[in-house]
C-alpha cells in the first residue's frame, strides 16, 4: 500500500513518454502499447492495494511522499495556524473503490480506443493516448489525494484533459467551442470550490480530509441555521455542480459529446463527472453537519435528474441521449448524498460506471459501424448487423432501467428507499425520473436496433455523408454497418458482465435477509463516511424502513420501469407512427425539450454576452477615458507649450524685439548724419564750435 | 560558504552585462554575428555567475547577504551599498535568466542597428540587477532611472508602428512617478537626519525608522505613485499595453518579466517596511485598486483583437493579483505575491516570446489573421498550451501556487475581497482559452499561414528553461518558498507588530513599539557598524557595534 503513489504516476509517465517522444517518433502500436501498459500496470497495482486494504485491520492508509507547499504561518479562526500541503495520498474504502473503477474501466477504454481511434493519422492517434493517459493520472490524483488541495490538482487536471479531449478534433469549431465551454463552466464551479477550500482552512487550520472530518465531528450540527460549515458545504457543492454537471452548471456536458466516444465513456460518464459526487461523499462528515445544505443538494440532485431525463426523452442523437442520461443519473447520486445515503451514492456511482461506460462504448460501436452517423433516425435494425453490440447494450439498458437482478436495480433502489424515508416529494420526482429513464433508454435501443433500417444504403454511400463526424481522415470506403473488431467488443463483454453482477455487492436488507447475504458495499464503505466520528457506529444513517415497505418500494419502481419500457416498445416498435403523432400533438412541449429549455440561449444572452459586452465597454472606457486622461494631459501640456510659445514669441520676445526696434528705428536719425563726406563733418564741427562758443559767451557775460 | 562574500559576487553579476556592452563598442557594426555571439555569451555568462545566489544563499539568516559597501558620495552620505536577501536574489536570477532568453530570442528578429540593440539590452540588464541589489536608496534611484533609457530606445528604435508615441509615453509615465518618488525618498532622508543626525540613504536604517503617521502617509503616496505606475496598477496602466504592443519581442519579455517587478519589489522593499502604519491605512485602497485591476484587466483582455495587447492586459490582471497578495499583509499572501511575481515573469514572459515567434514569421499581431496553427506548428501549439495553462493557474504548473497562496492569504483577511479576486480565475480561463481557440484551433483559413515553420531549435531553447521552471514551481515550490522565509518575516515584523515568524523561536514575542521590532533592532547592530565588517557576510548576528 505504500506504493499507491505509483498508481497515478504510471499513467502520468505514459503520458510523458508519449507526449514528449511519441507524438514525433512512435508508431501507433507502440504508443497504444505504452499507454495500455501504463494503465494495465496501474490496474494491477490498484488490485494489489485493494486486496491489501481488504485484509488490513485498519482500513485507512496515508502515504506522504513529499512536501508540496511548505508550512507558512497564517491566521485562522482559532489563532495562528500553518498553511501547509504535502503530496499525500490516502487509500481507504472509498478511494479504493474509486481507483478500481478508474483503472479498470480506464484500462478497458484504452483497449477499446486503440481500435476505435485507428482511423486517426499517427500524430493524432498518439496525441489521443497521451491525453487519455494524462487524464487517468489526474483522475487518480483526484481520487487518492488526501487533502483538498491535492484533490484540486486532480480536479483541475481532469478538467484540462476533458478540454483537450472534447476539442480533440479541434479543426471543428463546434468541438473547440465545446471544449472551451466545458473548461469555463467548470471554472465557474471551481470558483466556489476554492472559496470553500479557503474557508475550510480558515475554519479548521488544515486541508487534510481526515483532520477536517475529525474537527468537524466535534462541532455542533447546524440544524437550525446556516453556519460556517453550511457555507463551506455550499461552496464545495458549487464546485460539484460544475464538475458533475448539475443545475445550474450542467450545460457543458451534452456539448462535451463532441469528443471521441471513448472519451465520453471514460470521462463524461464513468469517472470525471462523478468527481463531484465523490468529493461530497469524501466530506460526508462535513455535509452531515450541514443539514440545510444537504437538503439543497438533494433538491438540486432530484430536479436535475428529472429535468435531464425530460430532455433525454426527445433527443435523437444517440450520444446526446446518453449524455442527458448521465446528467440525470448524476442527479440521482446527489439526491442520495443529499438524503445522507453516501454509500448508496457511491454504490450507484460504481454500477453507473459499468453500465454507462458500456452504453457509451456500445454507442461508439454503432457510430463506428454507421460511419460516424450519430442520428438514431438514420439507424434502425442494427441488431442484425452487430449482434454483440446489441446484446451488450441491451444489458446496459436493462441495468440502467432498474430491472432486477441487474446492477442498476440495486443501487437505484437503495437511493429510492433512502429518499422515501427522508422526503416523499423527492422520492416522487425520483420515481418519475426512473420511469423516464427506462423509456428513453429503450427508445434508444428500439430506434437503433429494431425496426426498419433507415440509414444510407452502402452501395452508393462511400462518401456522401459525414456532416456529423470526423471522417476527413477515413482512408477506406464504407461497406455498410458491421460488427466492430474484437478489440472493441471484448471491453463491451467485460462491462456487460459488470453491469449484470456489480449490483450483487449491495443487496438490500429485505432481500439479503431473505437469502442470507449482507450488504457488502455498505459495510465496506461506511468507515469512509464516518471517519473522525468517534463513537458513532455504522448505523449513523441507516435505513429504518420495514421489510414490507422495502419490498413494496422495490416492486413499485420495477413496475414503473416496466411501464417505461412498455411505452417505448409500443411507440417505437409496435406502432412507430404514434411517436410522430406525439410529436405533432405536443409540438410546443417538444420544441421546448429539443431546445433543452433554452437554457443555453439564456446563458448565452446573459452571462456570455454580458461579459463580452462589458469587456468591449471597458476597453472603450480604457481607450477613451483612462488613456484619454493621459492623452488629454499630454495634449494639455502641448497646448500649454503652444501658448507659451506664442507668448514667448509675441509678448516676451516681442518686448525684446520692440526695444531692439526702437533702437534700430531711433538710430535712423543719427545714421543719416553718417554720410562720409568731409565737408559735412566740417560744417557740423563748425556748427558745434559755434554752439559751444555761443553757450560759453552767453553763460559768462549774461550770468 | 561564509567566505563567498569576500568575493564581490553581486558586483560581478551586475557588471558582467556592462562589460559585454563596453566590449561591443569595439566591434565593427558590420560583423553582426560576432556582435550576436558576444551579446549572447555575456548574457549567459551573466546568468551563470548569478547561479551562486541560488546555491549559496543562507536561508536561515535574516541578514543581508553578499554585502558590499563602499563610500560613494560621502558629502551626502550616499554609499555603494549592495546586498541581497532571498527575495531580491530570486528576482536577480529571474532577471539574468529572462535577459539571456530575451537576448537569445532576438537573433533573427533584429537585423537593423544590431550593435546598438544589444548594447542597450545589456545596459538594461545591468540597470535592473543594480536596482535589485541596491541597499542604498539613492543608488537604487540611480539604477531605477538608468533602466529607463535603454528601454526607451529599445521601444523607440526597434518597435513597431506607434513606437515613438509608446516610447515617450512609457518614459514620461515612469519619470513622473519616479520624480515624485524621489521627493518621498528625500523626505525619509531628511527625517532620518532630523532624528539621528546622520545623513544616509541606507535602506536598512530606514527599515528601523518610526516616522510619524502624517509623514508616512505622504511618503507612502509619493512612493505609491512611483511604484504603482511601474506595476502597473489601475488606473496608471495605460502605458503598458502601448509599450508592450510596440516594443520588440525581447523588450516585451524583459518589460513583463522583470521591469514590472520593479514596482512590486519597491512596495515590498520600501513602502511596506519603511512605512508600516501608512501601509496598513492604505490597505483597503490598494486592495480595491488591485481587485479592479484583476477584473478590469481580464475583461479588457477579452475584448482585444491584437494578440500582444491581449497578453499585455492579462498582465495588468495578473499584477493586480500580485498586489493583492502583498497587501493581504499575511505571510502566506506576501509569499504568494513574491512567488507570483516570478511566475508572472515565466508565464507572461513566455507568452510574449510566443507572440514574437509568430510575429517574426507573419509580421502581424491580429488574432484573426491566425487560426488552426495547431496543425502547422504542433510543437509551438504544445508550448503555447503549457504557457496558457501556467498563466491561468492550472495546478501542477507554477501559476497555481502563486494564486492559491495569494487568495488564501487575502481570504483570512477579508472574504469579500477574496471572492471578488477569485473571479479572476474564471475570467482568466475565458480570455486565454478563447485566444487559444482563435489562434490554434479551427482550420487554416489564411493561406499565408500554411507554410509557417514550427519552432526552430534556437526558439525551442528559449522556451525550455521556462517550461522546466513552470513544472518545477508547480510540483515542488518548496525551494523557492524556503528562500523567501526570512524576507517575508522581515516585512511582516514591520507591518504586524504581533507577528511571530515560524522559524525564529527566539524571536521577540514582546510587543514592539509602534512599527518597531526588536528583531530589526538586532540587525541594526550590524548596519551601524563601521561598514567594512559588512563586507563579510555574518551568518551569526554579531554584536559588531
Tell me what each language-model feature is.
Chain B
Residues 1-9, 23-119, 194-210, 510-540:
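Transmembrane helix-loop-helix hairpins at membrane boundaries of multipass inner-membrane proteins
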Residues 1-4, 129-135, 268-282, 322-342, ...:
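Helix-coil boundary and interhelical linker segments in multi-pass alpha-helical membrane proteins
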Residues 11-26, 40-53, 94-106, 124-126, ...:
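Central hydrophobic cores of alpha-helical transmembrane segments in multi-pass inner-membrane proteins
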Residues 21-32, 99-111, 153-162, 231-245, ...:
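C-terminal ends of transmembrane helices
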Residues 30-32, 116-123, 128-215, 300-313, ...:
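Alpha-helical multi-pass transmembrane bundles of energy-transducing inner-membrane proteins
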Residues 57-79, 179-237, 242, 267-285, ...:
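Juxtamembrane/interfacial segments at transmembrane-helix boundaries in multi-pass membrane proteins
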Residues 234, 348-352, 418-451:
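Predominantly late transmembrane helices and immediately cytosolic-facing juxtamembrane segments
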Residues 377-380, 432-545:
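Cytoplasmic/organellar membrane-interface segments at the starts of transmembrane helices
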